[in-house]
From Swiss-Prot:
S-adenosyl-L-methionine 1 binds at Y51, G108, E141, I325. It is found in: Cytoplasm. Keywords: 4Fe-4S, Cytoplasm, Iron, Iron-sulfur, Metal-binding, Oxidoreductase, Porphyrin biosynthesis, S-adenosyl-L-methionine. Belongs to the anaerobic coproporphyrinogen-III oxidase family. Its main location: cytoplasm. S-adenosyl-L-methionine 2 binds at Y63, G109, T110, Q168, R180, D205, A239. This is Oxygen-independent coproporphyrinogen III oxidase. It holds the Pfam family Radical_SAM. GO terms for molecular function: 4 iron, 4 sulfur cluster binding; coproporphyrinogen dehydrogenase activity; coproporphyrinogen oxidase activity; metal ion binding. GO terms for biological process: porphyrin-containing compound biosynthetic process; protoporphyrinogen IX biosynthetic process. [4Fe-4S] cluster binds at C57, C61, C64. It comes from Bradyrhizobium diazoefficiens (strain JCM 10833 / BCRC 13528 / IAM 13628 / NBRC 14792 / USDA 110).
Amino acid sequence: MRADLAVSYGEERLPRYTSYPTAPHFSPVIDAGTYARWLSELPAGASASLYLHVPFCREMCWYCGCHTQIVRRDDLIAAYQRTLRSEIALVAETIGRRIKVEHIHFGGGTPTIMAPEAFAELMAAMRQAFFVLPSAEIAVEIDPRTLTADMVEAMRLSGVNRASLGVQSFDPIVQRAINRIQSFEQTAAVVDMLRHAGIAGINFDLIYGLPHQTVASCLDTVRRSLLLAPDRFSVFGYAHVPDFKKHQRMINQGALPDGPARHDQACAIANALKEAGYVQIGLDHFARPDDSMAVAFEERTLRRNFQGYTTDQGEVLLGFGASAIGHLPQGYVQNEVQIGAYAQSIGASRLATAKGYGLTDDDRLRADIIERIMCEFSADLGDICARHGAEPEAMLKSASRLKPLISDGVVRLDGDRLAVANDSRFLVRSVAAAFDAHLDPGKQLHSRAV
């Protein structure tokens, strides 16, 4: 990507578009009653994906942007697990039938902070409440520093078949600056343990733009990671938002790479992974050519949801736990963020919905366009608009932010078909943002575009 474009567009604060509209536009107008009605209206034959949020960690990583908190007492974790089980039963009862489940994802926080038997009980509760297909993908986010052999065995017995390992960086200087000391040897031992247990799908999460990070240290992390041969990589740019995440104030802002340096790091990582045979997928994922995500990318069936890129084709995502977000045909719902408020609602047999968003026809049209841009670096506006009963000319007229992108060669427009230039793919969020009718550039709610 041209360095001048990285400077002119890369500093913009834009959504990652894991939803449209994005979470800052959720409103308390959508409440527990709305969610209950939406659940009861799910069409017969609908299948779902499940997301379970476990908002606990043993220590705080200073770069973290997730909803989590430090916990020392195991009884608090056990109580939260019981609340999750109650919420699962409550949602299933509200739906009124045992719907099919094709994907389950445990996120956090650190989901593997639960006791192994508690994890197994939670999986059993889901299988009782829903019909989890034998082919379902069951994925768990893992902190390699705290994973135990007993938890791996519980995961194996529960049918887990994919694990996402937080790596971020193997550079000890960077690790000290973000309060996450994690050796290569620790990570390698966990990968070996998982594979020995038959959990074959291995993802690594890497981050660029961290304090004291350089192109050389990023490439060294990639080199070491490749020795462990994960199936997928997620490569994110660090989002420094200390006004929203107070613990990020522990990071020395003066040690953060500037925009051009972030661009160089992102390009270096991408080039190294592609040279190693991985397929670049969308904004921030890389996968082996035979991986299901690479196949979905090639077949143009890739989707995007709150976990990032996914092969999940479902239109229903049920979120469980404090702060969890769900997606239904009618719109989005988000649970109470505070654990106490969440537990109080579920304890009273009430859905814990705090806010959400009801989709309009225009939202659905724009969401489809944005998702295709984010997943394929292109969009056939004529085809998408026809499916929604809209005119592509009107949509293009409303996308005034496209004009400079076209002038700068970031985007090519051939009739109604839009495509992001190959050397500008890191700016795909800027292209998607052209179709975002809710975006307020004056509000610094999101991370840098690069």
